[in-house]
Design a protein with these regions (language model features):
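Conserved active-site and cofactor/substrate-binding residues in soluble primary-metabolism enzymes
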Residues: 8, 12, 70, 123-130, ...
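C-terminal active-site/capping subdomain that shapes the small-molecule cofactor and substrate pocket
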Residues: 206-211, 216-308
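N-terminal Rossmann-like NAD(P) cofactor-binding subdomain of oxidoreductases
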Residues: 1-175, 203-204, 256-263, 267-272, ...
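A broad, low-specificity signal for short, low-complexity segments enriched in glycine/proline
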Residues: 25-28, 179-187, 239-243
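Oxyanion-binding "anion nests"
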Residues: 172-215, 221
Length: 308
């Protein structure tokens, strides 16, 4: 049984990682967090402080990081030196050359090329890639446009609690991303990560991101132009056969919450141009984050692609 660590165990994603590891039969799990949360317990397990010494001690085989980019940059190298495979959820390493950015059902073989770190993609890039990959294989991709509707939990446990505590009439979440030139950094991430995952470095991808007053579950409206003709009926068949994707007449965040599949529907011709329009929803804490990271680790540990 591998010896596992979860850094950021008290956060929104970290807690889901801990729960999913238990569901999947992993019981040698140590929990780490900041000094502020150290000493608390999760499901009877003591939370330790995530220090360089603790992470580099050489007694962890896999370490899941669900912390901010600054903390990941500081702590991940120590765990790597200790011999652990580090699966990092932050943006710190995603676009770095030589570090695989992996969705197991899409480009799982890349995880086996790791040198101690595998990056876990953005919570919108994961479901988008899962839907685009089968369309890419069927007809090629010419261009992608996406509008995201992202839940409060995507910003973390504090943002989620704020939503749950405030009166419904005050649910008007402002944009909480930083500008990167003329677009949000989140929009840049989706474009660059999707290109890297699909191995299409020149693919035109345009994203518009919106934060919405939903607790859990991200939704995305997607417009796809393919290289070869692809009608809605055939696209529906292709997506129905894709791993970790389920065709649903009208996907919603509520329907996706608590599940491990990407729901995709509204598959139809794009009336404003060539291509297709579709809508998807995904639990951003599970397949959009925690589950994808665990599947990466399972893939590397087994040295074979994970089953959907």
């Amino acid at each position: 049984m591998p010896r596992l660590g979860v850094v950021g165990a008290t956060g929104a994603v970290g807690r889901v990682v801990v729960g999913l590891l238990g569901e999947r039969g992993f019981d040698d799990v140590r929990l780490f967090a900041s000094s502020r949360s150290a000493g608390t317990e999760i499901d009877g397990r003591l939370v330790e402080e995530a220090t360089p010494g603790a992470l580099s001690a050489g007694d962890l085989d896999v370490c899941f990081f669900s912390v901010g980019s600054k903390a990941s940059r500081e702590l991940v190298p120590h765990a790597v030196r200790g011999g652990a495979l580090c699966v990092d959820k932050s943006e710190a390493f995603r676009l770095q050359d030589g570090i695989p950015l992996v969705v197991p059902e899409v480009n799982g073989a890349r995880a086996l090329e790791h040198d101690g770190i595998v990056a876990n993609p953005n919570c919108c890039s994961i479901p988008l890639s899962l839907v685009l990959k089968p369309l890419q294989d069927e007809a090629g991709l010419r261009a992608v446009r996406v509008a995201t509707y992202q839940s409060a939990s995507g910003k973390g446990a504090r943002r989620l609690q704020q939503l749950l505590d405030e009166p419904q009439a005050e649910h008007d979440l402002s944009a909480d991303w930083s500008f990167d030139g003329e677009e949000f950094d989140e929009e840049t991430k989706i474009r660059e990560e999707t290109r890297k995952i699909l191995e299409l470095p020149e693919l035109p991808v345009s994203a518009t991101c919106v934060r919405v007053p939903v607790a859990v579950g991200h939704a995305e409206s997607v417009w796809v132009e393919t290289e070869e003709p692809l009608d809605a009926s055939r696209a529906r068949e292709v997506l129905a056969a894709a791993p970790s994707v389920r065709v649903d007449e009208f996907p919603t965040p509520r329907a996706a919450a608590g599940g491990d599949e990407v729901l995709v529907g509204r598959i139809r011709p794009d009336r404003a141009g060539d291509g297709l329009s579709l809508h998807l929803a995904c639990d951003n804490l599970r397949k959009g984050a925690a589950l994808n990271g665990i599947q990466i680790a399972e893939l590397v540990l087994s040295q074979r692609p994970v089953a959907a």
